[in-house]
Regions:
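Short small-residue beta-strand/loop micro-motif enriched in glycine and branched aliphatics
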Residues: 104-110, 163-166, 190-191
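Conserved, non-catalytic sequence blocks in retroelement Pol enzymes and Pol-derived host proteins
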Residues: 4-5, 20, 68, 86, ...
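Mobile genetic element proteins and their domesticated derivatives, centered on retroelements
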Residues: 11, 28, 32, 63, ...
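C-terminal domain-tail junction helix/linker
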Residues: 157-161, 183-236
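Basic, flexible linker segments flanking DNA-binding modules
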Residues: 1-71, 170, 224-233
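RNase H-like two-metal-ion nuclease catalytic core shared by retroviral integrases
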Residues: 52-54, 141-143, 149-152, 163-185, ...
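Active-site beta-loop-alpha junctions of metal-dependent nucleic acid enzymes
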Residues: 92, 110-132
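An active-site-proximal beta-strand-loop segment
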Residues: 65-108
Length: 236
């Protein structure tokens, strides 16, 4: 199976999207049980990012859990997460910074780096702006040190964006972004041991391409993020 994390609902969504087969979820569930088809186990989120010790700028939670946008580039969420790879007994880390659009749930931009620093986040933002020069979204993040940096706030202002931040210790304030990390790690990362940086980076890049272009989502109307994005552009 391409994604062992798939449960019966996602299998049914793929049947509708890829083959035009329309049956109800209960029938797919019965078939899955008869064939002993099960999704992989779920893993719990390990917690929220702490607030920066000496924040230079803090924004209100203007998003306020309004996780809906009528148009692309209306609301963007962002965050950084870490991955591990192994060289014998040595453990190494890489970091993924990404921006997610709330209308179509596409990954607008991402950067992979060896350090969780300002440059990682700034590059991610610059890529998003370069690809969407006319975008002026509400820009939401947690209160990590990169996002409370005065220089980053100035970059947002220059791009005509309004900054929003989660409350301290409230992961759900950035729920869809945290949800994307969970999806990626359940489907491609947890339960695997990566023996090289190259292998891990290839997995991440391949998955984001798969997620944007091939992974259908029920709340998008059984469309992929890029299909939803194109649909919105045509309707504008």
């Amino acid at each position: 199976m391409e994604s062992p994390d798939k449960g019966y609902r996602r299998i049914n969504d793929d049947l509708r999207h890829d083959y035009g087969i329309h049956v109800n979820d209960k029938r797919i569930l019965r078939i899955c049980r008869a064939k002993d088809v099960k999704s992989t186990i779920k893993y719990n989120n390990r917690g929220c990012t702490r607030q920066a010790k000496n924040p230079q700028y803090v924004a209100d939670n203007r998003l306020n859990r309004q996780f809906y946008a009528q148009h692309p580039n209306e609301k963007w969420l962002t965050d950084v997460t870490e991955f591990k790879w192994y060289d014998g007994i040595e453990i190494h880390k890489i970091y993924l910074s990404a921006i997610l659009d709330l209308c179509d749930r596409r990954i607008v931009s991402y950067v992979i780096g060896d350090r969780n620093d300002n440059a990682l986040v700034f590059k991610t933002f610059d890529k998003a702006v370069k690809a969407n020069p006319d975008a002026h979204p509400l820009f939401h993040s947690d209160r990590g040190f990169q996002y409370t940096n005065r220089v980053f706030h100035q970059k947002l202002e220059k791009a005509g964006m309004t900054q929003s931040m989660s409350r301290v210790g409230k992961c759900i304030d950035n729920g869809p972004m945290e949800g994307f990390w969970g999806i990626l790690k359940r489907e491609r990362y947890y339960g695997r041991r990566f023996a090289s940086r190259e292998e891990l980076v290839h997995m991440i890049r391949s998955y984001i391409s798969y997620y944007n272009n091939r992974r259908v989502q029920r709340h998008l109307g059984i469309l992929t993020p890029m299909e939803k994005y194109q649909q919105c552009l045509l309707a504008a």
